[in-house]
Amino acid sequence: TQMYLVIFPEGTRYNPEIPKVIADSQSFAEKEGLAILKHVLTPRVKATHVAIDTMKDYLDAVYDVTVAYEGTVDHKGQRKLAPSMTEFLCKECPRVHIFIDRIELKDIPEEQMYMRRWLHERFEIKDKLLIEFYDAKDSKRRNKFPGKSVHSKLSLKKTLPSLLFLGGLTASMLLTESGRKLYVKTWIYGTLIGCLWVSIKP
């Protein structure tokens, strides 16, 4: 079965508002003799190694994806938290930039020890891309990734069917008393469960 498996080797999000996570990541890299990264966290190799090793007979390549957001640097030049979906839809973040690099499977070391070095080198490349994106002294080079770019806009043709489906589903629920009760319960219990999950998950 054709599929994609997405892995975030850092294990958690890079959040400038939680400096302890960034500091812990950098001290781990220093302790292990690895390059200290500024705009990304130090990757851990285990899950990546297990995934690639298990799927190697079905893979021909791995895609290294780096994402950056415009409008997320404050007046002091410090990175802010990545925008939420609401902030993005309200145009507080004008564009999302995605840099994709295709790596042939044959170019990825099989042994975990060597794959660890390879993975960290990939994150060093990501870090350089993001330093250029966020911190470039030349303003013309800021908010851009190098190389040829393709601009992609969400067309009405792609978004309208989802809007009509979800809008129709919500409207049909709100037309009946039992539907309204279910709608309210979904909001209340969904929010409570979500808050509980966020507070107890490691």
Regions found by a protein language model. Give the residues of each.
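Non-catalytic C-terminal accessory region of glycerolipid acyltransferases
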Residues: T1-P202
